[in-house]
Amino acid sequence: MADARSLHRPLGFGVAAIVLLLDQISKWAIMGPVALRERGLIEITGFFDLRWVENYGVSMGFLIAGSDRERWLLVAGTALIAAGIVAWIWREKAKGDVVALGLVLGGAIGNIADRTRLGYVADFLDPHIGDWHPFLVFNVADAAITIGVLILVLRALLVREPKVPAENVDAV
């Protein structure tokens, strides 16, 4: 009989693939047919716009890559993190954690693809309240990473896995 890990792995990697696909399709649309790069800003509503931002750093402008060397260091660092997440998905038994890790992995790969192909990460989602912008401009990959990390934190704080009785634990 398969264990929980082998049953949940396809789910985690499937979530990652869906996030990557949605991220790259949205960026293709924004840079292609929508032509946001040329337009700069498209006002949608009083609380949401499309705004073109070339992000040369990571979250909140941290670790700005000012040179090609720094850019490739960011790519390598993100790839190492993604490899760690793959290993975590491979070992993880909890379905909720596997889904959250899939969100993070798909987002990380989406941003790696941008940084490799474009030299920056394309951000364009701009929620706001009037003139107040409580969030930085972000993309689908960033949203998936944030949601995945929040799920992991909430599950770590709130979810208690049932304990296995000692007689059911395999001897080493």
Swiss-Prot record:
Pathway: Protein modification; lipoprotein biosynthesis (signal peptide cleavage)
Membrane spanning residue stretches: 70-90, 94-114, 134-154
Reactions catalysed according to its record: Release of signal peptides from bacterial membrane prolipoproteins. Hydrolyzes -Xaa-Yaa-Zaa-|-(S,diacylglyceryl)Cys-, in which Xaa is hydrophobic (preferably Leu), and Yaa (Ala or Ser) and Zaa (Gly or Ala) have small, neutral side chains
GO molecular function terms attached to this record: aspartic-type endopeptidase activity
EC numbers on record: 3.4.23.36
Any GO BP annotation: proteolysis
Alphabetic keyword roster: Aspartyl protease, Cell inner membrane, Cell membrane, Hydrolase, Membrane, Protease, Transmembrane, Transmembrane helix
Enzyme class: hydrolase
Membrane topology: Multi-pass membrane protein
One GO term describing the cellular component: plasma membrane
Highest taxon of source: Bacteria
Active site residues per record: D123, D142
Subcellular location: Cell inner membrane
InterPro entries: Peptidase_A8
Purpose: This protein specifically catalyzes the removal of signal peptides from prolipoproteins.
Similarity-based family: Belongs to the peptidase A8 family.
Family matches, as PANTHER family: LIPOPROTEIN SIGNAL PEPTIDASE
Name of the protein: Lipoprotein signal peptidase
Gene of this entry: lspA
